Amino acid sequence: MKVRPSVKKMCDDCKVIKRKGIVRVICKNPKHKQRQG
């Protein structure tokens, strides 16, 4: 899980979702997991 100020899709499988006010990226590649903070 990477925590960064701006989350971006890193590949075509990445999905940007908003959960409880937190912007997250979920992907089948675990290296691409991110959250904003």
From Swiss-Prot:
<keyword id="KW-0687">Ribonucleoprotein</keyword>
<dbReference type="Pfam" id="PF00444">
    <property type="entry name" value="Ribosomal_L36"/>
</dbReference>
<dbReference type="GO" id="GO:1990904">
    <property type="term" value="C:ribonucleoprotein complex"/>
</dbReference>
<protein>
    <recommendedName>
        <fullName>Large ribosomal subunit protein bL36</fullName>
    </recommendedName>
</protein>
<dbReference type="InterPro" id="IPR000473">
    <property type="entry name" value="Ribosomal_bL36"/>
</dbReference>
<dbReference type="GO" id="GO:0005737">
    <property type="term" value="C:cytoplasm"/>
</dbReference>
<dbReference type="GO" id="GO:0005840">
    <property type="term" value="C:ribosome"/>
</dbReference>
<dbReference type="InterPro" id="IPR035977">
    <property type="entry name" value="Ribosomal_bL36_sp"/>
</dbReference>
<keyword id="KW-0689">Ribosomal protein</keyword>
<comment type="similarity">
    <text>Belongs to the bacterial ribosomal protein bL36 family.</text>
</comment>
<dbReference type="GO" id="GO:0006412">
    <property type="term" value="P:translation"/>
</dbReference>
<dbReference type="GO" id="GO:0003735">
    <property type="term" value="F:structural constituent of ribosome"/>
</dbReference>
